[in-house]
């Protein structure tokens, strides 16, 4: 059956895509429907067809999903920012966790990956500490501001974004009031004329400090001082008013030159018990509360004892590496953005951290240089951009032979691709935890602990079967079989690390497993009591420990 354009079909939505669309099937053909929720029964108009799939739009909701909710944002159907505002947050978290699992299994080729439950956010709104708001004009020529529609550069007017904090709304209101009176025109991407391009906003949630930056097609604005005065009057926590000059005929938001109109040219934030200086171009996670949870998890996976050398690649302003410095012997951070490296060094000095150094280099080049210098880090932290790591970088990191690699990813697909190459080079993914840094949007972060794997993933046991009176089949329970038994009978997920810990506690032999620590002093997650009980019972079931 080939669906036709404008055909109306009845469909039940059975899943969600990474983009937040619902997906169902009609006669074996997958139909993708934006704004649909898993469990919806819909009438859908077909908009575009192919041999094995089609795209449609909702004509009528025949029976809503229990997870469907009314969007609380008037712009959500047009704006390309929020992909999940039409479903409950619990359902959104399930969709994101499934997305991570699907990528790691399908692209990465991992069977039964040890994926822990996603770390959700306490607050799904008002969390963003950075915004880039395009300025344009409507059909009547009036100045407007908002966000781009999905997959386009058409501005959807939106004066109040639910994801942003109150000071950003205050800044936008004040800026538009000033701009409409000033007579300044909006930049036109087609003609490359007009002055006002973007309003760029940053906030340090830990201190409440706010930065407002006007991105202009030129060197400045007429009446800058009056704008700064209005912003100072209206914006809570304002510390910085800047002009960014961007004369390029491009859709890149920021130009290379910044000028301070009022205040300072940086913000100071508090995170993970430390202070961080943030410049306009510095990479800094956009969700303060969830970033702290993410970094705590990365530190836990690093298993530091106070002696290790940590190599922090793509370090930005040094947040991850500096958060680990108090538990490491030495930290080496690498970042390609010069201003971010300068901030990282300032941040180390600001916090009296003397065991950290920062290099301004490409990550792959820096890794090769460190190999040539004979550096052998114990732990490597990777926090690459969305495109993931280059193959040559992965090979260089593997050549360094660190005991652990902590990979922080913002894209499940490129993460899965990189995990596959790491596995080929002798590193296997152990603990995997998704973290929702971007509630209501399609994005999700993931933290992975990799360590050198044993070529044979089965438990290594050398037992006399006759003496123990068990069958050959009973003696060959793999870690995955133990995990499956516990999940089926106790509804608990356990890691290979926890199984190894319980086996050792029971006096059983444990082979060289990739989840085991390299030394007795290495700090690793400890098995919770309820999981220890379940593992013990599973080992009894497989006759690997005597019944008592």
Question: Whereabouts are the PLM-identified features?
Answer:
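Terminal RNA-binding accessory module
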Residues: 1-75, 357, 364-365
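Extended interfacial segments that mediate partner engagement and assembly in macromolecular machines
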Residues: 59-71, 77-186, 205, 221
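Short, charged amphipathic recognition helices of the HTH superfamily
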Residues: 471-484, 495-496, 510
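Short Lys/Arg-enriched helix C-cap and helix-to-coil transition segments
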Residues: 510-520
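Phospho-regulated, low-complexity intrinsically disordered regions of nuclear gene-regulatory
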Residues: 476, 524-548
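Flexible loop/N-cap segments at domain edges
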Residues: 199
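DNA-recognition alpha helix
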Residues: 478-490, 500-506
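Rossmann-like S-adenosyl-L-methionine
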Residues: 2-10, 18, 219-472, 479-480
């Amino acid at each position: 059956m080939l669906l036709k354009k404008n055909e109306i079909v009845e469909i039940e939505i059975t899943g969600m895509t990474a983009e937040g669309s619902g997906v169902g099937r009609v006669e074996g053909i997958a139909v993708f429907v934006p704004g649909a929720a898993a469990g919806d029964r819909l009438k859908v108009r077909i908009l575009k067809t192919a041999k094995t799939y089609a795209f449609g739009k909702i004509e009528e909701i025949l029976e809503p999903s229990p997870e469907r909710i009314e969007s609380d944002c008037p712009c959500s159907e047009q704006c390309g920012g929020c992909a999940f505002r039409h479903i409950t947050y619990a359902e959104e978290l399930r969709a994101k966790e499934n997305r991570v699992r699907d990528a790691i299994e399908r692209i990465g080729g991992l069977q039964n990956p040890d994926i822990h439950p996603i770390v959700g956010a306490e607050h799904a709104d008002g969390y963003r500490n950075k915004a880039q708001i395009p300025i344009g004009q409507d059909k009547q020529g009036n100045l407007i501001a908002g966000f781009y529609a999905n997959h386009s550069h058409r501005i959807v007017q939106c004066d109040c974004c639910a994801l942003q904090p109150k000071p950003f709304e205050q800044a936008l209101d004040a800026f538009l009031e000033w701009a409409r009176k000033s007579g300044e025109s909006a930049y036109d991407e087609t003609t490359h004329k007009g002055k006002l391009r973007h309003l760029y906003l940053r906030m340090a949630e830990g201190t409440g400090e706010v930065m407002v930056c006007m991105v202009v097609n030129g060197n400045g604005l007429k009446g800058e001082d009056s704008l700064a005065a209005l912003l100072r009057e209206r914006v809570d926590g304002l510390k910085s008013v800047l002009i960014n000059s961007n004369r390029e005929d491009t859709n890149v938001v920021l130009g290379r030159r910044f000028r301070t109109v009022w205040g300072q040219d940086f913000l100071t934030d508090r995170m993970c018990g430390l202070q961080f200086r943030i410049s306009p171009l510095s990479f800094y996670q956009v969700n303060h509360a969830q970033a702290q949870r993410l970094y705590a998890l990365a530190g836990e996976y690093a298993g530091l004892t106070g002696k290790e050398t940590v190599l922090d690649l793509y370090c930005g302003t040094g947040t991850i590496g500096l958060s680990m410095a108090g538990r490491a012997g030495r930290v080496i951070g690498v970042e390609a953005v010069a201003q971010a490296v300068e901030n990282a060094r300032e941040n180390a000095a600001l916090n009296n951290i003397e065991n950290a150094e920062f290099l301004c280099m490409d990550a792959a080049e820096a890794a090769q240089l460190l190999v040539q210098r004979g550096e052998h880090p114990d732990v490597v932290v990777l926090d690459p951009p969305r495109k993931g790591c280059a193959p040559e970088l992965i090979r260089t990191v593997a050549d360094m032979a660190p005991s652990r690699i902590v990979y922080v990813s913002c894209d499940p697909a490129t993460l899965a691709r990189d995990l596959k190459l790491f596995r080929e080079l002798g590193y296997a993914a152990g603990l995997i935890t998704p973290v929702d840094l971007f509630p209501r949007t399609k994005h999700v972060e993931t933290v992975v602990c990799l360590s050198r794997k044993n070529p044979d993933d089965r438990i290594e046991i050398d037992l006399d079967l006759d003496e123990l009176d068990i069958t050959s089949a009973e003696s060959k329970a793999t870690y995955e079989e133990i995990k499956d038994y516990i999940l089926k009978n106790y509804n608990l997920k356990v890691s290979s690390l926890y199984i190894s810990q319980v086996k050792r506690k029971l006096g059983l032999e444990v082979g060289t497993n990739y989840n085991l620590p390299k030394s007795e002093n290495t700090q690793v997650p400890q098995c919770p009591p309820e999981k220890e009980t379940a593992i013990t019972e599973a080992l009894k079931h497989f006759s690997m420990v005597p019944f008592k």
